[in-house]
């Protein structure tokens, strides 16, 4: 089974399990690390995820994967919180984390309101409207980035 198919199937199974526990699937990684495959689930819930939550999901999801048995390669299952630099994956994330500092990387060069052309932006998330993410950049100007041009977006931790 191709990696994309594994990720799609794991996503469906994980979302079903997690919704019953009032948790959400933030992201999935399925990749080779050294000679082994690693299936990594990043999960969260309102109020934050605990180590016990991760252990519970790991046990229960491991049982589901053993029953479904669709991953042909040997792999290691890891369940983790998304961490301080949580990725923004869904449109709802851009509303949920409004006002927070984010780092956005784009596929193509995007111009901010001052005419600066770049692919990496750091600023406070103003929100998402009409398929466009708005950031108030650290330099003071605004940037409007089409969601379709975003390669990666993460919360940034401020010290």
Curated annotation (Swiss-Prot):
Subcellular location, record wording: Cytoplasm
CDD domains for the chain: YlxS_C
Organism superkingdom: Bacteria
Primary location: cytoplasm
Any single biological process term in GO: ribosomal small subunit assembly
Family that this chain belongs to: Belongs to the RimP family.
Name the UniProt record assigns to this protein: Ribosome maturation factor RimP
């Amino acid at each position: 089974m191709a990696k994309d198919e594994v990720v799609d199937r794991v996503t469906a199974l994980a979302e079903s399990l997690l919704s019953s526990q009032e948790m959400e699937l933030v992201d999935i990684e399925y990749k080779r690390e050294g000679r082994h495959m690693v299936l990594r689930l990043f999960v969260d819930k309102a109020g934050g995820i605990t180590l016990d939550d991760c252990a519970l999901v790991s046990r229960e999801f491991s049982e589901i994967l053993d029953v479904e048995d669709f991953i042909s390669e040997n792999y290691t299952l890891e369940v983790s919180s998304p961490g301080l630099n949580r990725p923004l994956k869904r449109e709802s994330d851009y509303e949920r984390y409004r006002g927070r500092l984010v780092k956005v990387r784009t596929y193509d060069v995007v111009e901010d309101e001052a005419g600066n052309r770049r692919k990496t932006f750091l600023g406070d998330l103003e929100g998402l409207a009409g398929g466009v993410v708005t950031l108030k950049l650290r330099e003071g100007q605004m940037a409007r980035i089409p969601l379709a041009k975003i390669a990666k977006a993460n919360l940034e931790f401020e010290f």
